[in-house]
């Protein structure tokens, strides 16, 4: 694997949600061989993160197609972060996938992106599309995080603030520690997309990478997800000393190996 990244091109923009809250979504797409790589980022992250860039560089080196984008309210896309919901970001994920992907795709989702990847798989199964799933690579996946990892863990005081004011500013250990909004809409709308209460059919191989020292998504959450997936061709790798980001060189190497194993 080379350490040199391809030259970063300017993003193209597509409009999503024309009939309801239209927003312009920033996308970087490179044509190439299949299976292509489709990146789904995490909550309050963007497509210029370490893992996204490393996968894009690997795709460029191997002549593979690569697509990444920013959800509304993230990175270079339009919109306010506080307006975001799981359904809104899923709509954008499906729109980008449909417009820029063709043939089999290895969908890689980090944290919230893991939830998005599972929801995307469900949407793909509903009707024929130009692109299909070669497999999923889920990095510290956080399905149902708005309910299981946020709401259920919030104190009564925080819950009350969200319910009465509609928002709570959560302190962050990332991005310089700037607090970010957790809205009532995010929590309530997220309940429309919960997955962990039943089996999850994705119709493709799944590779899960989870850090044992992850303070944001406990390793038990990844095990719970694995138990909901079909038993065949699902591999969970526990990186005992890994944190939530899994962005160290050795972590990146494992992620790329998982992508390459699928195809």
Q: Which residues does each PLM region occupy?
A:
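Gly/Ala-rich beta-loop-alpha elbow adjacent to hydrolase catalytic centers
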Residues: 109-117
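The serine-hydrolase catalytic nucleophile loop
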Residues: 43-56, 220
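Conserved alpha/beta-hydrolase
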Residues: 54-78
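The alpha/beta-hydrolase serine catalytic core
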Residues: 8-13, 129-239, 243-263
């Amino acid at each position: 694997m080379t350490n040199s990244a391809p030259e970063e091109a300017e993003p193209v923009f597509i409009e999503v949600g024309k009939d309801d809250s239209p927003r312009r979504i920033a996308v970087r797409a490179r044509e190439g061989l299949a299976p292509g790589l489709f990146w789904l980022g995490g909550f309050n992250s963007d497509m210029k993160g370490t893992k996204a860039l490393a996968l894009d560089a690997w795709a460029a080196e191997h002549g593979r197609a690569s697509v990444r984008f920013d959800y509304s309210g993230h990175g270079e896309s339009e919109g306010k972060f506080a307006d975001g919901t799981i359904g809104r970001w899923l709509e954008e994920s499906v729109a980008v996938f449909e417009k820029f992907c063709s043939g089999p795709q290895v969908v890689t989702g980090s944290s919230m992106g893991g939830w998005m990847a599972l929801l995307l798989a469900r949407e793909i199964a509903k009707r024929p599309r130009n692109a299909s799933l070669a497999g999923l690579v889920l990095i510290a996946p956080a399905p149902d995080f708005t309910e299981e990892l946020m709401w259920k863990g919030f104190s009564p005081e925080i819950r009350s603030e969200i319910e009465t004011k509609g928002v709570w500013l959560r302190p962050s250990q990332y991005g310089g520690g700037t607090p970010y909004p957790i809205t009532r809409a995010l929590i309530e709308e997220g309940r429309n997309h919960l997955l962990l209460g039943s089996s999850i059919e994705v119709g493709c191989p799944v590779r899960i990478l989870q850090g044992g020292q992850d303070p944001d998504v406990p390793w038990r959450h990844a095990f719970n997800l694995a138990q909901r997936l079909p038993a065949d061709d699902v591999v969970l790798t526990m990186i005992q000393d890994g944190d939530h980001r899994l962005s160290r060189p050795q972590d990146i190497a494992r992620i790329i190996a998982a992508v390459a194993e699928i195809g």
